[in-house]
Amino acid sequence: MATLKEKLIASVADDEAAVPNNKITVVGVGQVGMACAISILGKSLADELALVDVLEDKLKGEMMDLQHGSLFLQTPKIVADKDYSVTANSKIVVVTAGVRQQEGESRLNLVQRNVNVFKFIIPQIVKYSPDCTIIVVSNPVDILTYVTWKLSGLPKHRVIGSGCNLDSARFRYLMAEKLGIHPSSCHGWILGEHGDSSVAVWSGVNVAGVSLQELNPEMGTDNDSENWKEVHKMVVDSAYEVIKLKGYTNWAIGLSVADLIESMLKNLSRIHPVSTMVKGMYGIENEVFLSLPCILNARGLTSVINQKLKDDEVAQLRKSADTLWDIQKDLKDL
């Protein structure tokens, strides 16, 4: 007796499952992981989305909740499992998993605890998707991107840290607000470490090709009567401010990660400030990852732009590198 489905649908091709073309995996379904997931779905970047976490009930609940929105999405397959086999054949894997910093905990201790988590996660990712590009989002992102590169054995053009893509977006938003224009028309770069020691490249800030530092030579210095330096301070403080108000940050980083993925999956060769291996650049001698303007396309992170930095900006970058290396050099089991 033919089933309803057989009566309704006449098969033309064999019913074998197609290998996905643009599969994306998100590891960790906390606030940041799910913001990444919804941003990826909202931009229709994936033909399959896989979620992985150790919390099985939470994981299944998030998967079902997204699946129930399938009518409003163009992503035909959404899957989840604590077993990494569900991630097989991913083009891009976003890592948001990790332990939270405890009150009074040193950064080194937090990093070492996250290294121990990554030692389980990263080999599993590479086992099932050996050709993937990994985007690291977990903090401290620059150090954990280095850790991922070490543990994965992947070439450095396929291990990327979300880095200062969000810091630069915050910078452009805050500058644009002051000027009354859209952030996409206000150009400026935050480089270096994602976080407290990031570097604002004031010499490159421009609107419609007009250098703002030429209009106000004191811009970004302590002598500036308009106090533009405060904008960079607001960028650095903004995460702490949001965390104080709502407990965590998630929407902006989720949108930022989807922006990076779009440049890669659509082979756009757009330039983003993301974390990459900077040894040999700007006189940095250690294997550290910092954000520089990088070209992202279908091959991953293919090139770095040689930004013309002023002496004090280079000094700040090197200081960032030293700060990170001080922590990295003491990490165990890499």
From Swiss-Prot:
NAD(+) binds at residues 30-58, 100, 139. It is a peripheral membrane protein. It holds the Pfam family Ldh_1_C. Keywords: Acetylation, Cytoplasm, Membrane, Mitochondrion, Mitochondrion inner membrane, NAD, Oxidoreductase, Phosphoprotein. Its EC number is 1.1.1.27. One of its GO terms (cellular component) is membrane raft. The modification N-acetylalanine is found at A2. It is an enzyme of class 1 (oxidoreductase). It comes from the Eukaryota. The modification Phosphoserine is found at S11, S44. Pathway: Fermentation; pyruvate fermentation to lactate; (S)-lactate from pyruvate: step 1/1. GO terms for molecular function: identical protein binding; kinase binding; L-lactate dehydrogenase activity; NAD binding. Substrate binds at R107, N139, R170, T249. Transmembrane segments: none annotated. It is found in: Cytoplasm; Mitochondrion inner membrane. The modification N6-acetyllysine is found at K7, K58, K119, K329. Belongs to the LDH/MDH superfamily. LDH family. Interconverts simultaneously and stereospecifically pyruvate and lactate with concomitant interconversion of NADH and NAD(+). This is L-lactate dehydrogenase B chain. It comes from Mus musculus. The gene is Ldhb.
